[in-house]
Structure formats: structure tokens, C-alpha cells
A protein has these predicted regions:
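An exposed, glycine/acidic-rich loop-and-rim segment of catalytic or binding clefts
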Residues: 1-156
């Protein structure tokens, strides 16, 4: 079972001006069809490294980021826009976070009108034995928790 919330967020300005911070040190690379290959790759020093606040700019994201401490409620991501003094924090018990910058959006929305921060299990997990198991057996119970918190921030 791999349920995810595909809501789009925009804190009031152009998406390129939003800044992102991720609590992830790894991600799952994909093939030419955007299907995870089974590899878990490090982020440190790569263009996908959001371990410090970084403006989204024109970077197109549609990547699954691996979160530490699977099963514990912890911060997965923070998104902020200094111009509006707004910040969104995403907390979850899920093992991964799909980040999508909406580059493929079309009518009635424009490309990059929002960003998805989707707490989830690993995509393609049933076909990748090294990914966390997402199979829910008969009689099993599925529980997960995801919190979206909004707050005002001070301008610096």
C-alpha cells in the first residue's frame, strides 16, 4: 500500500523564489521512463542536495528522496517564501518524500504553479527487493501520519 497526498503548494509567489530544505541524504534514481531502478544514491554535493536551504530556481524536480528514521514522526521537508514570510513544514512517519515541481502541469494551471511534497513509500517497491516492503497482507493494518504545518517566519 502506497498512499500519497498529491496536493500542490505555493506560498504566494513564483515557484522559483521558494526555498526548499529536505531531511534526506539519499534518493532513488530512475530510468528513462521515470521508474526507480532499485538503486539508492547519495545526495551530498549533487544538484539534488537540499540539506541546506536552497532556492528552487528553474530546477525541475520529480524525485523520491529517502528519509532517515523510517516509522518515526520527523520533519521531512520545509518550504519557505521570504517575500510572504510563510513557511510550510512537512512531518511524516513515511520512509520517503516525492518532490514534484509541477513542470508538467497544463490548463487550467501553468507549469510550476505549485510544488508537491508527497510523503510515501518507495515507488516501485514491489519490484525492488532492497526497498522497504509496502505490501499489506490480508488482516494487516496500514498506519502512517503526515502533518502539513504553516507558520509565519521573520524576514532576515
Amino acid at each position: 500500500m502506497n498512499l500519497a497526498n498529491h496536493a500542490y503548494f505555493n506560498l504566494g509567489g513564483h515557484l522559483s523564489e521558494h526555498e526548499l530544505l529536505l531531511n534526506a541524504g539519499e534518493y532513488t534514481p530512475v530510468n528513462h521512463r521515470l521508474i526507480p531502478t532499485g538503486e539508492i544514491a547519495p545526495l551530498k554535493g549533487s544538484a539534488l542536495d537540499y540539506s541546506d536551504w536552497k532556492a528552487l530556481g528553474d530546477t525541475a524536480l520529480d524525485h523520491n528522496f529517502v528519509l532517515p528514521e523510517d516509522g518515526k514522526l520527523r520533519r521531512a521537508a520545509s518550504l519557505r517564501l521570504r517575500a510572504t514570510q510563510l513557511q510550510l513544514d512537512v512531518l511524516t512517519t513515511q520512509p520517503a518524500l516525492q518532490v514534484y515541481t509541477g513542470d508538467g502541469l497544463n490548463t487550467p494551471f501553468a507549469p510550476r504553479s505549485g510544488i508537491c511534497l508527497e510523503a510515501q513509500g518507495f515507488p516501485n517497491a514491489p519490484n525492488q527487493p532492497n526497498f522497504p516492503n509496502i505490501v499489506l497482507e490480508p488482516g494487516g493494518t496500514y498506519r502512517q501520519r503526515t502533518i502539513y504545518q504553516f507558520k509565519k517566519i521573520a524576514t532576515a
